[in-house]
Amino acid sequence: MGKNKYTLAVLGAGTLWGFMGFFRRTLDTMGLSASNCIAVRGLFAALLFGVAMLITDRKAFRVKLRDAWCFFGSGIVSLLLFSLCYFKAMDYMSLSNAAILLYTAPCFVILFSALLFKEKITARKLAAMVIAFAGCCLVSGIGTGSKISTTGILFGLGSGICYALFSIFSRFAINRGYSTFTINFYTCLLAGFGAMAVGGAEFIPVITSTAPNLLFAAATGLVTCFLPYLLYTYGLTGLENGKASIMASIEPVVATLCGIFIYNEALTVMSAVGILLVLSAIVLLNLKSKTA
């Protein structure tokens, strides 16, 4: 399959992330805060990664002290801060505007990767980035929300930058020989405990009060954190950061489709065009070319 397997892995990750809205809404009904949701995702995913490592390779738990910053970066600076900034941005602007600023992430990934890893900024990559961003804007409903502020913009851009940094810190860890399991175990563990430090642990009695609640919390960690981050970091082992980040833009497309099929939300012309643009960007990136 060549690089196709890495492409499919990243697309799979973006698809699973697209279901986050469904899980977040359900956790909201249980009374969990934004930081509680992050803790649930991170800790259950860390548990799954830990079990997998115990079964397959216990040596994967070993991390050199001089490399600890990679995992602090991916867990605290990226996963935790990206989520907190994104949720905070929603307090100062519409959901659509917050989402649009989050989707600036591929721009930062391409820039940082060019500076740090000497990845080439090709015309095709730039074109795909612009097309994907335009598609994300349309899918998110640009212009439908008027509430906006400087504080909201700063939090929104912060979410985009922190989101982008996961690819960067993960690349540093991959280049140092760490497996996708090691990277994600410590990323999720640190993000989970970091979220508990911010929002407390009052969610624990809630999710353990009934078997359905506990199963749903575990499913949240599995579907929105364990599987997508495993797939995405695996994709990074065979793809450039910039390409992977752009292809992960399939996430808002899936989120929109979830809204349509699960919550009976209407598919607008704007959203339909946005979906086509995102898919076009993904196709453009995967056309064979010596310069792509």
Which residues make up each language-model segment?
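Transmembrane alpha-helices of multi-pass small-molecule transport proteins
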Residues: 29-81, 108-109, 162-169, 184-203, ...
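C-terminal transmembrane-helix exit sites in multi-pass transporters
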Residues: 48, 53, 86, 105-130, ...
